[in-house]
Amino acid sequence: MKITRMNVTPVAMADPPLRNAPGIHEPYVNRLIVELVGDDGQSGFGEAVFSSQTYEDLQKIASIVEGIGALDHAALYRIVSAQLAFDQEEREDPILKNFRTVAPKPPMAVSRTFSAIEVAALDLAGKQLGVPACDLLGGKVRPSVTFAAYLFYKHAGGGGEGDDLREDVYGEAMSVEGIVAQAKQFVEENGFPSIKLKGGVFPPEQEIEAIRALREEFGPTVPLRIDPNCAWTVDTSVLVGRELQAELEYLEDPTATIPGMGEVRRRLLAEGIDIPQATNMCVTEFSQIPESVREDAVQVILGDHHFWGGLRATQELGRICQTFDLGMSMHSNSHLGISLMAMVHLAAVTPNLTYDVDTHYPWLHESDEIVEGGKIKFTNGQIAVPDTPGLGVEVDRDALARAHERFLRISYRDRDDVGYARKVIDPNWSSALPRW
């Protein structure tokens, strides 16, 4: 069960023009596919968020993992840490650069690099042993994983450029009516039982109206959440919490920093309003949890194995959340089926996963998927945990080659929602937050 080779393949997939507080998604988003080849000829796959730095880091590791066991994750982590940890403090974080209100912290190069390797190693070991990846993580506690509909304000267009345009499956949604129509389509096609709206795009009054319209359309039993990506001041966050106290299951990252979130929490509680606050922005590493608990700033943490350091590390996050009576869900970014199935296996082994999981996956066009059989289907908003070896999916080599060729052809590299907003929305677009 030794690793004989590691391949790193950058790929591109079309991305619709989805809006968020920093700006707008570019026509393409890139990912990194990690392949570990075993001594029996089988391959395991992992998927990472693309940045030029992460690509370089993974390439550094690729030449020195030969001979390591697919289950010797401690050795793999030592290799990654030794190669990358020395210069972490000097790097700018390629993701957080879009969110200038987030408190500066060291980039998570080791966590992000190791995560994709760990997933690939679990996939490989599962295939070699004939067991699903979740069994290697302690065994599943649920037979299926439930996801939430993830709504975005959206311009017309399906992503891609030139002669590589995608069909606009969901249409424009830049109004309250458009958001409700988008939600109905997501629920009808996938059966999602809960709904999340990416906010921070329009003045809060309009986004409050959108949440109320969703409540009216879907009734009192469908959980609703909103995430403005820290676009609001503390005062505005309190106002929104007050206005939507009857509608929201939780309020995600209304304002920046742990102290800011703590102040919102205290002021709402003083008014008798107990809306849980969630985050994937002010608590993104273990060292930030103590302050968050002291401040009572966050009641729900959105884990993400891509950023927290892998599947086992995110399992540990779940145990810490349970210790402090915190809820847990999962954060999402634009991703392919490898990451989706890694999320499914992680959710399957995390008892304290108390909320439906976020996913961008419905926004992925069928033609951009690289796993065999095409896009993975949701049934009643759920994906069953596979009993097949590894992650339960295989990579379509031809589709992988096409996605890599697309990456080589396009000019987009590190994600830049802000820069693209200056190109297509307003040349003077500012990413400064809070905006309201």
Where are these regions (language model features)?
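Alpha/beta enzyme core
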Residues: 177-194, 237-249
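Metal- or metallocofactor-binding catalytic centers and their adjacent structured scaffolds
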Residues: 37-128, 427-436
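Glycine-rich, aromatic-flanked loop segments that form ligand/cofactor-binding clefts
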Residues: 108, 112, 119-160, 335
